[in-house]
Amino acid sequence: MREPEEDEEEKSGDQAPRILGPDFLDHTACLPPNMHNDWISVLAAENNRRISDANEWNHVFHTPRSAEYIFTACTRLRLPQEVKYSALLIFDNFMVQLVSRLHESIYNSRRSDRKKYQEWNRIEATLSRQVTLRMLSAIQIASKMHSYHDSLSIQTVKLCLKTLGFAYTEESVVRSELRVLSMINWEPAYHSTPLVYIESLFKILKMKWEHVEVCNYWRYILLVLDCVFIHWNDVYKRMMANVLGPSADVVTREQMCRVQADWFLLACGVIVTASCCIDGMRTADEITNELHRLSNIPLADITDMSVAIIECIINQQGPIANISSIQI
């Protein structure tokens, strides 16, 4: 027989809110320090593959509006932070593949130019109506990648669409998910999201910098990363302008996409920006040096990335920017 007190304790434990983010103070199952370099090497190898695979069509549908929509949906659905970044990348990849194939099909058809134009207008209208469904499918897939047990169910996606004014059936939700997966060749994304790179570097930093306020830093890191994802093109254009000056205008889209594919650079820039906001430039410089040692990203590149992020954030605040939060 179980004691009543034990049952009550178990019930209260089940009702406790689950921690969806990383716990940097919990060292259970952590890699020992002598394996940190091995894990960084794994991330570096994946990072190099992603840079090599980058092309001019990456991030075409990664716009401020699509990022804000997906981020808002994930927030209201109370999904883990990592899901929204994966969902946005999946959605962008799917839309690029879908639109390019549809365009190729129309272009190679034997219709007259007028018929092709009419058919393409019809396709654009259909794609526009289905954008919300495709975004929810991308979120559903991303939630399964993070934790299948806690992923969005078909019923939840259907209810969410109904709340937004779309009367899709459960069968339509399933077909959409399969459509997204098949279009991206059943490869949702690289194994690690940008947040994994940030979390890994920050975890190693935390072991050396014990005085760092983990919760405060992580909150700022997530805010900064959200800003970067929402204002993606603006941040990288500013960074290239900082690096190349007037010559930045001749940078091709493919070259820009290769820079955007470097998630170690992104991770370092985000962490340094967060440290600059919290502890000022002196601490940010020290963290920059440590991140350079861990990631092999040049010091100047990390600085240029963080400066571009700060410039973008200040610019988004309007002409009367409140920069008091950034300690010089």
Task: Name the predicted role of every residue range.
Residues 1-328:
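Acidic, serine/threonine-rich low-complexity regulatory regions at protein termini
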